[in-house]
A protein has these predicted regions:
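Generic "edge-of-domain/loop-turn" microfeature
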Residues: 12, 33, 76-78
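Short acidic capping loops at alpha-helix termini that bridge into adjacent secondary structure
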Residues: 53-55
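Short acidic, gly/pro-rich beta-turn/loop elements at beta-sheet edges
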Residues: 15, 36, 79-81
Length: 91
């Protein structure tokens, strides 16, 4: 399945937020330097989704805050796992 997200690196905490428009924003602690944030994003999502890192691949957005990921898993499973960690935006 493909997942479009907005990433906010250099955050105080790692968290997944559902924005008011329904889009997903992932805050991560890693700095956006030399691909560290992208690597950390895959590691973080691997933990959240309980999948090996090899099942998560960055398709688009290597140097952008908007990213498209390919996740080699059933869509229902991914959605269920994400919903366990989801916080809703206050705006």
């Amino acid at each position: 399945m493909k997942l479009r997200i907005k990433v906010k690196p250099n955050s105080r905490t790692d968290e997944i937020i559902c924005e008011a428009d329904g889009s997903l924003k992932v805050k991560i602690k890693a700095q956006p330097v030399e691909g560290k944030a992208n690597k950390y994003l895959v590691e973080y999502l691997s933990e959240v989704l309980n999948l090996p890192k090899s099942k998560i691949r960055l398709l688009k957005g290597e140097s952008s805050s908007f990213k498209t990921l390919e996740i080699d898993s059933e869509e229902n499973y991914v959605n269920d796992r994400l919903s366990m960690f989801l916080k809703h935006s206050q705006s």
